[in-house]
């Protein structure tokens, strides 16, 4: 895991990013959706570091000219999807995905791509891009919930462009109690085991999504975000 384990807080991770030389790729306009509870600051910094031109958006019309979209995630499933509805971004996200331009969901932004969640007996419907529901880790495993910290990826779709240069066994950073259960196993790009094995990332067409936080996952995470920017260019 090289230098990963000693960087466990957000401030250290942001400092780690800032102390490296920024990439000089042509700017790609990536819309970073602000729905009021996403982890915007660290995601924005990491995207800028790997060469993206980032536009923080709060309105549906701001997605029109974006080359790619990132839906970040911190907080609850209901808060995310209800905020997207209030800001008229719910339908806008669905429409954007329909255009075939790259879309990245992170953590709750990943969960929101599915139909529903059992979190807090949620009644809110997700974006419904993929069939499936979001479930809580079992209490039978004896492990602490939420999962907070580094864990390994098993890359099951090595041809996925988002995971280029990322071997199985790579460590990434998780903070979550819930995870999606896709109905279609063909969309699963990586798996991770924390008492039970779950889909830690998915890929279908131009949609990529991760339960872990690339912006907190240092070298591996930056490579993933760089791969996403390259898809957007």
Describe each PLM feature range.
Residues 30-50, 215:
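N-terminal beta1-alpha1 ligand-phosphate binding loop
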Residues 75-148:
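Cysteine-nucleophile active-site neighborhood
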Residues 115-194:
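Pocket-forming structural segment of enzyme catalytic cores
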Residues 206, 210-233:
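Acyltransferase
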């Amino acid at each position: 895991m090289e230098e990963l384990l000693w960087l466990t807080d957000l401030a250290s991770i942001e400092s780690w990013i800032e102390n490296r030389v920024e990439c000089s790729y042509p700017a790609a306009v990536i819309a970073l959706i602000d729905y009021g509870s996403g982890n915007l600051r660290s995601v924005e910094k990491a995207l800028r570091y790997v060469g993206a031109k980032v536009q923080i958006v709060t309105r549906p019309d701001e997605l029109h000219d974006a080359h790619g979209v990132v839906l970040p995630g911190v907080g609850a499933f209901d808060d995310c999807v209800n905020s997207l509805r209030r800001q008229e971004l719910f339908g806008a996200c669905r429409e954007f995905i329909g255009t075939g331009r790259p879309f990245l969901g992170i953590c709750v932004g990943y969960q929101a791509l599915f139909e529903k969640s059992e979190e807090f007996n949620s009644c809110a419907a997700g974006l419904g891009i993929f069939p499936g529901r979001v479930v809580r880790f079992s209490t039978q495993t004896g492990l602490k919930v939420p999962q907070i910290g580094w864990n390994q990826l098993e890359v099951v779709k090595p041809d996925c462009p988002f995971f280029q240069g990322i071997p199985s066994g790579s460590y990434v950073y998780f903070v979550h109690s819930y995870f999606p259960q896709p109905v279609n196993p063909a969309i699963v790009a990586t798996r991770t085991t924390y008492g039970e094995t779950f889909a830690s990332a998915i890929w279908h067409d131009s949609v990529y999504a991760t339960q872990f936080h690339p912006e907190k996952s240092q070298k591996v995470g930056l490579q993933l975000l760089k791969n996403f920017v390259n898809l957007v260019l």
